[in-house]
Amino acid sequence: MALTIPRSQYVATYGPTVGDKVRLGDTDLWATIEQDFLTKGDECKFGGGKSVRDGMAQSSTATRDNPNVLDFALTNVMIIDAKLGIIKADIGIRDGRIVGIGQAGNPDTMDNVTPNMIIGASTEVHNGAHLIATAGGIDTHIHWICPQQAQHAIENGITTMIGGGSGPADGTHATTCTPGKFNIERMFQACEALPVNIGFFGKGNCSMLEPLKEQVVAGALGLKIHEDWGATPAVIDAALKVADEMDVQVAIHTDTLNESGFLEDTMKAINGRVIHTFHTEGAGGGHAPDIIKAAMYPNVLPASTNPNRPFTVNTIDEHLDMLMVCHHLDKRVPEDVAFADSRIRPETIAAEDILHDMGVFSIMSSDSQAMGRVGEVVTRTWQTADKMKAQRGALGDEGNDNFRIKRYIAKYTINPAIAHGISQYVGSLEVGKLADIVLWKPQFFGVKPEFVMKKGFISFAKMGDPNASIPTPQPVFYRPMFGANAKANTESAVYFVSQASVDANIKAQYGIQKETLAVKGCRDVGKKDLVHNNATPEITVDTERYEVRVDGEHITCEPATKVPLAQRYFLF
């Protein structure tokens, strides 16, 4: 006999279902659940008097020898994912990977249990009702200046960090390159204790091929070209030749001063080959004043860095000071001041907001400690989305913001994964991928996760006083959990590397414990493959007034005077 309960009671017990709207933090973004995979009346819920008990939603007979038995079941959770959409489901995890999105439980007593999502005595369970699950974020613009960045990143929901450097040397302060085998090997060894997936860029600034190839063989997952090392056409061509041969990506910070050519010369050197452009607006560096035009090309995978996301009344002043420090400039030298002024343009920064909202800019990243904040990638993304809704209105959805939400979450999850050949491993909550999962209370979405899982094991979490009688008493702050400790840490995170380095067995050479996974398909992608962010309109820039036009229409917006996800959530 069926029991009918009020919708409010159902939501209070099992969380929202199809048609229910959930506000994201204190933004004006509202997510509506599009599909619910759960069978009403057979929901799995753990606790006193609840259903996940022996012989009820937990099988009495299934052992872990049965490959359909889960290690971890995250039940009744709302999922926001660029590929899966905005849905309600149980998430099943086994051997560190997502094995099912559907209905978990006991097939002996329940209908419609997804075949490989059996809850048994071997299964840990967490109630996901009233929580939002997202894929772990991916930051592709890391200056490895200090190892402490990893903790700040994971506390904002970033689980994969790609970049370069070797500590607080001048070369690392300015560029995201780990140059040469010695430095690459030491960085792999140094990062064994960090709780995130990691990939390193080799230094791509060399006009000859062999010095580039040896870095890829040493473990670089890609090459980074930076103007401070000389972003010349010869360097660009050489790096791309090696990338095409060895199936790795090239990232580029182009020539702000136009010393060796203009944007057109750089695009000619790229010659239609795929490339990932960093801070494509130009405040972080790049051909002044029109690097933003690179975003219109089908072979360019354009990214932003977060310090000018979104455009606010404080953006310009802050950037001038940051730039002087990061690129070793002197306010007493007129040429250095002119260099800084050429990069910081309110007109193109304003246009960048709109290009993100149009799906022209595809990726969000940090530029950590080098004109960017490693712990704010997720937050700045949603602040930009909220600002654009306020200034541009809805993006076609009726009564919700689902399309805009999926467009923006793709910018720091699936799209950077596609750009760097790791989308078969991370970037979404699709079945088969690593169980790198971030859980949020809706009111803290985009700011402070409840906890972060790495390969199906809890790595970081908000945690109260360890000496208290329950987990919640203050002071509550982020602490490393068992997944970030000792050998569990090396089992819960991976290194992304080139196939050539896997073939060379760098894991044994360097004596590292983390799994090494090869990047794949880096040279076969284009902007058309980027999810919800693949627009290629014609972009022009007035070189005197810096006005940006898209298909002939001038685009601009006002700087924000207030943003969400800000002081309401932080003491400082």
Swiss-Prot record:
It catalyses: urea + 2 H2O + H(+) = hydrogencarbonate + 2 NH4(+). Its cofactor is Ni cation. The active site is at H327. Substrate binds at H226. InterPro entries: Amidohydro-rel (IPR006680), Metal-dep_hydrolase_composite (IPR011059), Metal_Hydrolase (IPR032466), Urease_alpha_N_dom (IPR011612), Urease_alpha_subunit (IPR050112), Urease_AS (IPR017950), Urease_asu (IPR005848), Urease_asu_c (IPR017951). GO terms for cellular component: cytoplasm. This is Urease subunit alpha. It comes from Actinobacillus pleuropneumoniae. The lineage of its organism: Bacteria, Pseudomonadati, Pseudomonadota, Gammaproteobacteria, Pasteurellales.
